[in-house]
């Protein structure tokens, strides 16, 4: 019996998942991203260094039988990429991509998987919005290469706006958490009441009430907020990224500056990619801090941005070409002399190179599922014909 949130990926779905993994990683490699493959397990002091409480809860812990130290089974590959960059990235721009299994203690959502196949890309060492634009472009190039019938909708946010307002208002940690909870619940009436007694409360309410209208948001904020360089820059970055998406990819874009689910991890632009009417995002991405390789002891950050997705979520939205499944005539195969058998094996090798799936039967009853063709002997020649 399998636990809840854990399932076998079988047959054609398993084949499709492997094709998708290979195709998407090759797309990333051709865009200049270096493929890395971190291990499934690490000591928790490195795997969970700086991790959010949510990630810590999602991580299975085990005892290393060699050392007695606590190890974690990765629930997210991104922290491992931070470690790799800290030791190998240097001070310049570095691009990484990856694809691997992760394991969660709890499913995300009611029917979520606890064993996603996580694929992603990261850029380290670039503060410019050009890095975020590049990642978005790479993401759409990947999705378009799959020829999906589903349409990708992007929801943009920027944690700097709320974070900076909280600093200007000198909010306590409890007030900050309360506002974030009200934003998450979309509870405008209660939010309005709470904001009436908060410093710069009108600004916090404005984020929820008018934050989707990014072109006019700055003008609705207080003069103090309007004059803050970080807030002005954040709004400008959102406008530029939205315009780029609409012009370059003609996709639907929405803005939600109160999307703060990664508040304690992200440091700037955040984005979620949704397909069709699904409520859980297919892709999550945004800005975060890495660590400079020569400054680990001083804990100084290295700018980074990235995205990740669960490849298995694509299975329902993609189709592969129908396979050609070939069976060799059992009786004819077993009556061949050595020379004839060698000629047959050469033809079988040629068919397999062309993508045919050729089964050499072990018995007369040995027949593959989904048979489309037979290879039969006629007039001393092996002929392929549809069934």
UniProtKB/Swiss-Prot annotation:
Family the UniProt entry places it in: Belongs to the class-II aminoacyl-tRNA synthetase family. HisZ subfamily.
Name of the molecule in the record: ATP phosphoribosyltransferase regulatory subunit
Assembly, per entry: Heteromultimer composed of HisG and HisZ subunits.
Gene3D superfamilies xref list: Bira Bifunctional Protein, Domain 2
Note: This function is generally fulfilled by the C-terminal part of HisG, which is missing in some bacteria such as this one.
Family annotation (NCBIfam families): PRK12421.1
HAMAP family: HisZ
Statement: the UniProt record of this protein carries the keyword Oxidoreductase: no
Pfam families per record: tRNA-synt_His (PF13393)
GO biological process, one term: histidyl-tRNA aminoacylation
Alphabetized UniProt keyword annotations: Amino-acid biosynthesis, Cytoplasm, Histidine biosynthesis
UniProt subcellular location: Cytoplasm
Primary location group: cytoplasm
Annotated metabolic or biological route of this protein: Amino-acid biosynthesis; L-histidine biosynthesis; L-histidine from 5-phospho-alpha-D-ribose 1-diphosphate: step 1/9
Function description: Required for the first step of histidine biosynthesis. May allow the feedback regulation of ATP phosphoribosyltransferase activity by histidine.
Keyword Amino-acid biosynthesis: yes
UniProt-listed SUPFAM superfamilies: Class II aaRS and biotin synthetases (SSF55681)
GO molecular function, one term: histidine-tRNA ligase activity
């Amino acid at each position: 019996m399998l636990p809840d949130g854990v399932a076998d990926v079988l047959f054609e779905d398993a084949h499709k998942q492997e094709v998708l993994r290979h195709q998407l990683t090759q797309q990333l490699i051709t865009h200049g991203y270096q493929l890395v493959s971190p291990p499934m397990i690490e000591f928790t002091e490195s795997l969970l260094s700086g991790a959010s409480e949510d990630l810590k809860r999602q991580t299975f812990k085990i005892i290393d039988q060699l050392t007695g130290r606590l190890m974690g089974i990765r629930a997210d590959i991104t922290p491992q990429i931070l470690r790799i960059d800290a030791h190998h990235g240097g001070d310049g721009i570095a691009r990484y991509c990856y694809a691997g299994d992760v394991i969660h203690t709890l499913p995300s959502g009611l029917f979520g998987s606890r064993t996603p196949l996580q694929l992603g890309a990261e850029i380290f060492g670039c503060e410019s919005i050009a890095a975020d634009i590049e990642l978005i472009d790479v993401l759409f190039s990947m999705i378009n290469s799959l020829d999906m019938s589903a349409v990708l909708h992007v929801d943009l946010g920027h944690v700097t706006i709320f974070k900076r307002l909280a600093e200007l208002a000198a909010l306590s940690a409890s007030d900050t958490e309360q506002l974030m909870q009200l934003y998450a619940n979309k509870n405008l009436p209660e939010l309005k009441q709470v904001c009436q007694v908060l410093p710069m409360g009108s600004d916090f309410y404005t984020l929820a009430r008018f934050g989707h209208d990014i072109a006019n948001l700055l003008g609705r904020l207080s003069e103090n907020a309007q004059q803050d360089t970080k807030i002005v820059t954040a709004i400008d970055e959102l406008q530029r990224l939205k315009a780029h998406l609409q012009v370059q990819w003609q996709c639907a874009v929405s803005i939600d500056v109160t999307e703060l689910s990664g508040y304690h991890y992200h440091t700037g632009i955040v984005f979620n990619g949704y397909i069709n009417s699904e409520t859980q995002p297919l892709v999550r991405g945004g800005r975060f801090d890495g660590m400079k390789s020569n400054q680990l002891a001083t804990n100084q950050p290295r700018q980074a941005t990235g995205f990740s997705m669960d490849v298995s979520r694509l299975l329902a939205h993609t189709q592969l070409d129908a396979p050609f499944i070939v069976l060799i005539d059992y009786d004819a195969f077993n009556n061949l002399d050595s020379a004839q058998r060698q000629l047959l094996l050469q033809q079988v090798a040629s068919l397999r190179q062309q993508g045919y799936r050729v089964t050499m039967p072990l018995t007369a009853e040995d027949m593959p599922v989904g048979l489309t063709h037979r290879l039969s002997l006629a007039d001393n020649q092996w002929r392929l014909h549809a069934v």
